[in-house]
Structure formats: structure tokens, C-alpha cells
UniProtKB/Swiss-Prot annotation:
Domain notes: The histidine triad, also called HIT motif, forms part of the binding loop for the alpha-phosphate of purine mononucleotide.
Major localization listed first in the record, in broad terms: nucleus
Organism the protein comes from: Xenopus laevis (African clawed frog)
Subcellular location: Nucleus, Nucleoplasm; Nucleus, Nucleolus
Site entry (Interaction with DNA substrate), positions: S179, H256, H267, K282
Enzyme Commission numbers on file: 3.6.1.71, 3.6.1.72
Record protein name field: Aprataxin
Protein keywords: DNA damage, DNA repair, DNA-binding, Hydrolase, Metal-binding, Nucleus, Zinc, Zinc-finger
Length: 347
């Protein structure tokens, strides 16, 4: 069974273990190093479900506890999942959860986790390259589909070394933070961002643009991030232009409303959706409904409102019928949809 850990995103202290199906209460005190008097000593009640991969959160204190910037209130228990950010009180003191494979020596594991956590800060965990901006030497395997016909022949699997590294660092939702530092995955990088191949591409061309800065989700973005987001958009368009041709399907540039990975990332994806990794309705609807926020729309929201507005219950659109993104005809199954899409491919 996996073990659940509560991790301070500020890196102020070691991880806190959340035993399966046991209630853990945290708040102001030496364990969290929170001294804010607005935070109760019993601010938040947590109960991990290591089988289902989430933590039930209940606010116990008077002042608001929130997940991804949304207050949870005193009356409800809310699911905290990998990739989400828990703010203990007043949108301060951010935490995330990780699920690690259980250790046969729990004490040694805890000591190792605390030791590694105490050395890690948000700055040194992600800003691995602060050299003068430079473009990587592009290898054909890094920037083009895996066959000469322009199609992805099979859904890629994780390399052995990467699998071991990801497992040692945490839950699959943390995988991006490993991939963005893997030279074999990188297509371009500078002092602000890195572009990587999507490990499970949903189209013939699918890249991710990520900031080195640790930003958990769209809801964390503020006006001060505008220049960074504009830079991500510009780099995404350049990558699409440089590595495709006039016969390629058009591209879209945007973000998932609620990212599956715990690091904000811009999708640069061709609209052929010709990939064996595109397997289910959730995959499809995440790129063809309002769940996919256009990059320019995000930029305009930051310019106008200083933040990104994500619709309530936006996840419901992932359950809507399968509609072709070109002609809007409904398709009964994914195989039927994928066959239908061939009619729209560039000739």
C-alpha cells in the first residue's frame, strides 16, 4: 500500500506522515512551525485514504482553510488530491500531498524523507538551470513524431531509470518535476521556462511549456506572473512553428482548468489528436471543451482581473458526450471518434 505524506511547499520542515484511515490534526505549533495567531492549534483535520489516493480535509479553526484558493468552510469535508494545494489558513502556509510506496522500515524511511526535505527548498528544487538562456541541440526524437509517417506508433512507456526516480520522489502527479529536468525530454529551455515532450502525447505533436518557478495551478497566478505567462505563450508558438510544416493540423495553446500534475504547464498540441495515448472520454474532453483554457484567455484575465477565474464544477464537462471538435458530430465511443477524426486530417 502507498503511504501518504503532507509536504510543506515552503520547505520549512520535514514531511508529515498521514497514516491510512487515521485522523491527523495540524495547525499552529512546532510540527508545522506556524506561529500565526490567526491559525488555530487545531486548524485542520486530515484523514488519508491511501487506496483511493486522496485526503479528506475538514476545517476546524475559525479562519478559513482553502484548497487551490477555494475556501472549504466548516461544514464539509473536501477531498485533497495530488496536484492540489492546501492553504492552512487565510491562503497562507501551502501544503501538498504525496503518495509513496510503503517502506519495510518506516523509521528509516521517515528519517530519510525528513533529511531530504530539510535540504530542499522551492528555489533549489526547480531552478536547476540559471545559466545564460540557451537553446538545446534539438534531436529528431525530441521534436518530432516517432515514425516517418508523422504518427506516433505506440504510447511511450517510462524508461527504467525514470520510473525508479519518479517512484523514489513521490506520486505520479509529481512526474513533471522529474521530466522537466531530464535532458532527454527537453526541447528548449531558458532562464524562465523549459519545454518538454509530453510523455503521453494526445496528438502527433504535443509539448508542455513549464516555468522553472514553482506554481501549482492557474488559481495561484496573479498579475505579477503576466510577463512569465506571455513568455510561455510566445515560446509555445515558436516551438510549433519551428517543428511542424504547412501540412500539419493547426495547434491550440492552453491550460487545463484543473491540472493533473502539481506544476502549472501550457499545452502546445496539434489538433489531429492522432495518438494511441488518447484513450478515453476524459482525455478527449479535457482538450476540446471549456476545461481547456486558451493561453490568450488566461493572459487577458491576468491583465484585466489580476487572476485566473476557473468556473465552479468545471470538472463536470469531462463527462459530457464525445463531440468531434471540428464538425461537432457526436460519436458513441472513442474508437468510433478516432476513426471519424481521420476525415479531418490534413491531406
Amino acid at each position: 500500500m502507498f503511504e501518504c505524506w503532507l509536504v510543506s511547499k515552503d520547505g520549512k520542515h520535514g514531511r508529515i506522515r498521514l497514516p491510512h484511515a487515521e485522523t491527523v490534526v495540524i495547525g499552529r505549533g512546532p510540527e508545522t512551525q506556524i506561529t500565526d495567531k490567526k491559525c488555530s492549534r487545531h486548524q485542520v483535520q486530515l484523514m488519508a485514504d491511501c487506496n483511493k489516493g486522496y485526503v479528506k480535509v475538514k476545517q476546524m479553526g475559525t479562519n478559513p482553510t482553502s484548497i487551490n484558493g477555494v475556501d472549504i468552510g466548516n461544514e464539509h469535508k473536501v477531498e485533497l488530491k495530488p496536484g492540489h494545494t492546501l492553504y492552512i489558513v487565510n491562503n497562507l502556509y501551502p501544503y501538498m500531498i504525496e503518495f509513496l510506496e510503503g517502506s519495510t522500515n518506516p523509521r528509516a524511511k521517515i528519517e530519510n524523507e525528513n533529511r531530504s526535505s530539510s535540504k530542499r527548498t522551492p528555489e533549489n528544487s526547480l531552478n536547476v538551470d540559471t545559466e545564460t538562456p540557451r537553446k538545446l541541440v534539438k534531436k529528431e526524437s525530441n521534436v518530432s513524431p516517432s515514425s516517418s509517417s508523422g504518427r506516433i506508433s505506440s504510447c511511450p512507456t517510462q524508461g527504467k531509470s525514470n520510473v525508479q526516480e519518479v517512484k523514489s520522489q513521490g506520486h505520479w502527479s509529481q512526474d513533471l518535476k522529474v521530466s522537466m529536468q531530464d535532458p532527454t525530454m527537453q526541447v528548449f529551455k531558458d532562464d524562465k521556462i523549459v519545454v518538454i515532450k509530453d510523455k503521453y502525447p494526445k496528438a502527433r505533436y504535443h509539448w508542455l511549456v513549464l516555468p522553472w518557478q514553482s506554481i501549482a495551478s492557474l488559481k495561484v497566478l496573479r498579475a505579477e506572473h503576466l510577463e512569465l505567462v506571455q513568455h510561455m505563450d510566445a515560446v509555445g508558438h515558436n516551438i510549433a512553428r519551428e517543428h511542424t510544416n504547412s501540412k500539419c493540423a493547426p495547434f491550440r495553446f492552453g491550460y487545463h482548468a484543473i491540472p493533473s500534475m502539481s506544476h502549472v504547464h501550457l499545452h502546445v498540441i496539434s489538433q489531429d489528436f492522432d495518438s494511441p495515448c488518447l484513450k478515453n472520454k476524459k482525455h478527449w474532453n479535457s482538450f476540446t471543451t471549456d476545461y481547456f483554457l486558451e493561453s490568450q484567455a488566461v493572459i487577458e484575465m491576468l491583465k484585466t482581473h489580476g487572476k485566473v477565474n476557473v468556473k465552479e464544477r468545471i470538472s463536470d464537462v469531462l463527462k459530457t458526450p464525445l463531440l468531434c471538435h471540428m464538425c461537432k458530430k457526436e460519436q458513441a465511443t472513442m474508437p468510433q471518434l478516432k476513426e471519424h477524426l481521420k476525415k479531418h486530417w490534413p491531406t
